[in-house]
Amino acid sequence: MGFSPSSSWFLHPQLHHVVSKMSYFDAFLFYIVHLVDKLGLWHRFPVLLGVAYLGLRRHLHQRYNLVHVGPINGQGYDTDEFCYRTADGKCNHPSDNTIGSQGSFIGRNMPPSTSQYGILDPHPSVVATKLLARKRFIDNGDQFNVIACSWIQFMIHDWVDHLEDTHQIELEAPEEVASGCPLKSFKFLRTKKVPTDDHHKSGAVNTRTPWWDGSVIYGNDETGMRRVRVFKDGKLKISGDGLLERDERGVPISGDIRNSWSGFSLLQALFVKEHNSVCDMLKERYPDFDDEKLYRTARLVTAAVIAKVHTIDWTIELLKTDTLTAGMRINWYGFFGKKVKDMVGARFGPLFSGLVGLKKPNDHGVPYSLTEEFVSVYRMHCLLPETLILRDMNSENVDKENPAIEREIPMTELIGKKAGEKASKLGFEQLLVSMGHQSCGALTLWNYPNWMRNLVAQDIDGEDRPHLIDMAALEIYRDRERGVPRYNEFRKNLLMSPISKWEELTDDEEAIKVLREVYEDDIEKLDLNVGLHAEKKIKGFAISETAFFIFLLVASRRLEADRFFTTNFNEKTYTKEGLEWVNTTETLKDVIDRHFPRLTDQWMRCSSAFSVWGSDPNPKNWVPLYLRSAP
């Protein structure tokens, strides 16, 4: 029983029903969070207060924004027999062997939408053409480069994809926008609705493993795993030029190959090299390890390196503030920091020692999965450019800040099967340096890549599908099809105040004019994806605050619910040397330096490999991180 509405005069009227479901303690915490939100203060707080606010908000989301979908019908098993990551994600949860496996249900962070609006209201092609389609390329400045853009595809292909039905749908652009649509109509497969055994309800199934298990390079099942392995010394297949091998069809050989492009494949190849290097190290230290033991241990180590790079490197660049730098490092190392954790281990619980290395996983009473809402806020195709700017690495005048431009390659030449051949001609180093020196797109209105509105999509086996698709329109359709709430309903479910006028969303007068036109001045009709791209951003954030609060919940959950980042994150499972490999790797730059020792010295000035390489490094700040004042 929560506080009565009369005790909360400052509470937004549309949030009373949310508070009424809370315990007294949680309602009290919510009032604190809500007051801070109304004043717009949390990101202006000194670091410690900002981190405290995020801790309170995360607690509330863990209590009220985790919704399980589907039956729980797994079996118990002996965790000592499965001290490795299985091919299909089974046997991770300590008491249920199917939680988090391939083919499990995609969960939710809130109930499905109760919206009265139809799936074509307004038409997705109208939304895509009038509000999303790129008019001119808007970049992200020096904060995020094309490597960072590729990284998030690398992660999504590790985590989640929806099972599709065999039933085909056709979207035909209305006459008012047809002339501006690259495709006047397009066909696609709808998301398959699978019965959940819960009062005739249905849900969607994940064809990938939702654990942070590196399945993007290892595969999501036994067949995929066998395809990528050499079956000698634990290693994975890689070509002599350091890029992915390709089969007789020209399809890359890697864990997940659907809808790939050269930048994505480059990261797959880099971490195949990382895996194989771990195998070499382990074989030298443990000559009695057979192929299977080497493979399993190297996979654990490599997956942990990927998770760590994402947590304390990529995310920190995405949310470039002192508060989020502190928060993400606390997630991994705890409040006491790396030095203390390295000396004494994870002895002091999640707050002081971090989520990694906990005695047992914590799913907060809701079986682990990734969620529909998580998928929606990770729709970041605006990060992709129209062309890749190729840098000349053989020029006599080597300029680390701004290497000479050799030429621009249209992105359409870097996708699908032809991407592998193009990458081989260019070489790993030229591709990586070029991506590092190019700013990616900004997540804003009118910045959706035009080439993705006339796209050849691929099947799970990497083969091209017969029908071109308009991804901008399709993404609007997908959120509605899957019951993801629209923008205002989404915010209310996330314990945020809804907007009551367009000016609260954006200061852009042109955007307000078009939003009113497209949504018939009905603010409740606003699509989530459009709202996230239109929303005013916190200084330093590449994403919206609304999207960030889903990140806040799920980023922690991916670590704390996983047995191999908690109970089994130890020397017995990883080996002493394997654990040291993870503990001494802090950034993507560390991984690059391991395999290309002189590359970053010659071509990179900045502090993170995810920032534009020619930009200035982070300035030295002598004030301890936790004691820094408001920005």
Swiss-Prot record:
CDD domains referenced in this protein's UniProt entry, alphabetically: PIOX_like
Annotated GO MF terms: dioxygenase activity; heme binding; metal ion binding; peroxidase activity
Cofactor: heme b
Known EC number: 1.14.99.-
Expression across tissues: Expressed in seedlings (cotyledons, young leaves, and hypocotyls), flowers, siliques and old leaves.
Keywords: Dioxygenase, Fatty acid biosynthesis, Fatty acid metabolism, Glycoprotein, Heme, Iron, Lipid biosynthesis, Lipid metabolism, Metal-binding, Oxidoreductase, Oxylipin biosynthesis, Peroxidase, Signal
InterPro entries in the record: A_dioxygenase, Haem_peroxidase_animal, Haem_peroxidase_sf, Haem_peroxidase_sf_animal, Oxylipin_biosynth_metab
Residues under site feature: Transition state stabilizer: R258
Residues bound to heme b: H157, H381
SUPFAM superfamilies: Heme-dependent peroxidases (SSF48113)
Residue positions with a glycan: N583
Signal peptide: 1-20
Active site positions, chain numbering: Y378
Single biological process term from Gene Ontology: leaf senescence
S-adenosyl-L-methionine in keyword set: no
Summary of the function given for this chain in its UniProt record: Alpha-dioxygenase that catalyzes the primary oxygenation of fatty acids into oxylipins. May be involved in the senescence process.
Similarity section: Belongs to the peroxidase family.
Name this protein carries in UniProt: Alpha-dioxygenase 2
Organism: Arabidopsis thaliana
Gene this chain is encoded by: DOX2
